[in-house]
C-alpha cells in the first residue's frame, strides 16, 4: 500500500477575514459584495443579556442547520495555528470513523447489484442445505463481513491521511501558496475544520477535510466553514470550487447543495487510498464517489 502526498500548487494565498485590506478598494468592495449576495451571513448570536431561556424540544442535527451556537456564543472561523494540530487531527479522525457503519450498512442501499448477489448467496445456501436456520444466518454473516472490511479499509485510509497531509497541517496547507486550512473555534476549543487547495491547471479550488465535532453539529458550523472556502476562491479569482465525497448521509449532500454546489456525477469504481483491491474487499466493501462543482465565473 502506497500513500503519496497530495500535489501542492502555487497561488497567492489570501485569508478572507485577515487579508481584505491587501486588495485595492474598488476590487475589494466588489468581491465582498458578491460574496455577501451569494452566501448571506449566519444570523448573529444574541448577547448574554438579550438571550432568552432555552426552549424545550429536539435540537436539529446534520451540520446544515441555522441555529446559533449553545448559549448564544459565537463561533470564530480563522486560520489554523500549529498548536491546534492534534485537535484538528482528532476531529478528522472521529469524523472518518463514523463512516465505518454508514458504509457497511447504509451504503448497501446504493449498490443494488451487491444486494442481488447477497440474495443469490442466501438462495444458494438454502438450495444446498435445505435449512431455514442456516439461510437466515447468511444475511447476518454478510453484514458482519461488510462491517469488518469497511473498518479495515477505512482504518487503512486514515493511516494514509494521518501520515501525509494531516501529519503536518502547517507544512501541507499553511506554507505553500494557493492552499489554506481553517478551524472553527468555540469557547477556545476547535470544533470544526476545513481545507482548500488550488489546482492551477483548471483554475479551480478543491474543498477538502471538512469535518465538525459531532457534539456541535446542527448549528451552521459546517456551512460557515464551506462559505470561507468559497470566499477564499472568489478573492483569489478562481473560476470554480470542486469537491469529492464518499459520504453516505443525505445531510452531507444537502449541505453542499445549500452552498450552491451542483452534483456532477457519481462513480462506483472509486479506489479509496488504502484499498488492496482483493477479491474479498471487492465483495464486501463498495463506496460511491460523488463529484460536486460550484461555478463562480466563466473562463
Curated annotation (Swiss-Prot):
- For the keyword Endoplasmic reticulum, the answer is yes
Keywords per UniProt:
Acyltransferase, Cytoplasm, Endoplasmic reticulum, Membrane, Microsome, Mitochondrion, Transferase, Transmembrane, Transmembrane helix
The regulatory note on its activity is: Aminooxyacetic acid (AOAA) blocks its activity in both cytoplasm and mitochondria.
* Tissue specificity statement from the Swiss-Prot or TrEMBL entry: Expressed in brain, including in mesencephalic dopaminergic neurons of the substantia nigra and ventral tegmental area and oligodendrocytes. Expressed in cortical pyramidal neurons and granule cells of the hippocampus (at protein level).
Disordered: annotated span: 44-70
Location in or out of the cell: Cytoplasm; Microsome membrane; Mitochondrion membrane; Endoplasmic reticulum membrane
Q: What is its main location?
A: cytoplasm
Whether tRNA processing counts among this entry's keywords is no
Any one GO cellular component localisation term in the record: mitochondrial membrane
Q: Which top EC class is named for this enzyme in its record?
A: transferase
Q: Which Gene3D superfamilies match?
A: 3.40.630.30
Question: What Pfam families is this protein classified in?
Answer: Acetyltransf_1 (PF00583)
As for what it does, the entry says: Catalyzes the synthesis of N-acetylaspartate acid (NAA) from L-aspartate and acetyl-CoA. Promotes dopamine uptake by regulating TNF-alpha expression. Attenuates methamphetamine-induced inhibition of dopamine uptake.
What's this protein's name?
Answer: N-acetylaspartate synthetase
Q: Upper lineage ranks? A: Eukaryota, Metazoa, Chordata, Craniata, Vertebrata
